[in-house]
Amino acid sequence: MWTPRIAVNHWLLVTTAIFGFLTFIWIPQASAECQTRSIYCYECDSWTDARCKDPFNYTALPRDQPPLMTCNGCCVKMVRHQRSPYEVVRRMMCTSQLQINLFMVDHVCMMESSGNGHMCFCEEDMCNSSKDLHTNGCQLHLITIAVAMSWLMGQLLSR
């Protein structure tokens, strides 16, 4: 007999399978690309280097711009508002300097839990220079959908 509980379980199984398949296809491709080729990333810290600011002065001589480094991972940009929204500390680097699993972070921007900062990852030459570094978004949408579905299923199954 087809009951609402069976329908919900069936829907959850199908949706989980689709989500798992999409995650299996999209995320490893992006991570593999990020790990297999070298790119150039800016490396600087605005706390100690005045050249590390948004936006960069692209008309300045190379010695007056933040240093570039060869990166065998993704570029990283961390921005943190210290004491006020106007006092911003920026740090740019390569993921090889962090203890981070690229499978989890590629094309992602993560907000600090306090809301005072964020960390973004990208995989093109000098991409961590951008003032408006944004995420690709497809993984964020999938994660949001998965969390919403989990909550909804929990609500439906608890009845």
Swiss-Prot record:
It is found in: Cell membrane; Membrane raft. Residues 77-91 are annotated as: Loop 2. The keyword Coiled coil does not apply. N-glycosylated probably on Asn-57. Its main location: membrane. InterPro entries: QVR-like, Sleep_regulator. Disulfide bonds join C41-C75, C44-C52, C71-C94, C109-C120, C122-C127. It comes from the Eukaryota. GO terms for biological process: negative regulation of membrane potential; positive regulation of circadian sleep/wake cycle, sleep; regulation of circadian sleep/wake cycle, sleep; regulation of synaptic transmission, cholinergic; rhythmic process; sleep. GO terms for molecular function: acetylcholine receptor inhibitor activity; GPI anchor binding; potassium channel activator activity. Keywords: Biological rhythms, Cell membrane, Disulfide bond, Glycoprotein, GPI-anchor, Lipoprotein, Membrane, Signal, Transmembrane, Transmembrane helix. Interacts (via loop 2 of the three-fingered Ly-6 domain) with Sh/shaker; this interaction may stabilize both components of the complex and may be required for targeting or retention of Sh/shaker to neural cell projections. Interacts (via loop 2 of the three-fingered Ly-6 domain) with nAChRalpha3 and potentially other nicotinic acetylcholine receptors; this interaction is required for antagonism of nicotinic acetylcholine receptors. Consists of a single Ly-6 domain, adopting a three finger fold stabilized by 5 disulfide bonds. The first loop contains a region essential for protein folding or that is required for localization to the cell surface. The second loop mediates protein-protein interactions. Bifunctional regulator of neuronal activity in the mushroom body, and possibly other regions of the brain, that acts as a signaling molecule required for homeostatic regulation of sleep under normal conditions and after sleep deprivation. Reduces neuronal excitability by enhancing Sh/shaker K(+) channel activity; possibly by stabilizing Sh/shaker to increase protein levels, accelerating its activation kinetics, slowing C-type inactivation and enhancing recovery from inactivation. Specifically affects the A-type K(+) current. This is UPAR/Ly6 domain-containing protein qvr. The lineage of its organism: Eukaryota, Metazoa, Ecdysozoa, Arthropoda, Hexapoda. The gene is qvr.
